[in-house]
Design a protein with these regions (language model features):
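Amphipathic alpha-helical scaffolding segments comprising HEAT/armadillo-like alpha-solenoid repeats
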Residues: 11, 42-49
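Non-catalytic interaction surface on structured domains
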Residues: 46-49, 67, 73
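Short linear motifs in low-complexity or flexible loops
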Residues: 38-39
């Protein structure tokens, strides 16, 4: 369960922006990762996986973030 409804709403907004952006900013992803809770980890990783799968040459930054969070979530 999210910490608060406001936290959940804020996270959904940020995740939506990351998902819609072809090249999401590192600052925006850093902000999400600082506030990331168990309820949003899978959603965040799914967005990152979709971006990596859709790009022939995915960014090292996205790959590093996926690696970090898949290890942290295990």
């Amino acid at each position: 369960m999210p910490i608060t409804k406001a936290h959940d709403r804020y996270m959904r907004i940020l995740l939506e922006h990351i998902g819609e952006s072809k090249y999401p900013s590192g600052e925006l992803m850093d902000r999400v990762e600082i506030l990331l809770d168990r309820d949003h980890v899978d959603d965040y990783l799914e967005i990152l996986f979709e971006k990596v799968e859709a790009d022939r040459y995915p960014s090292k930054q996205l790959l590093d973030r996926i690696a970090r969070w898949t290890l942290a979530a295990s």
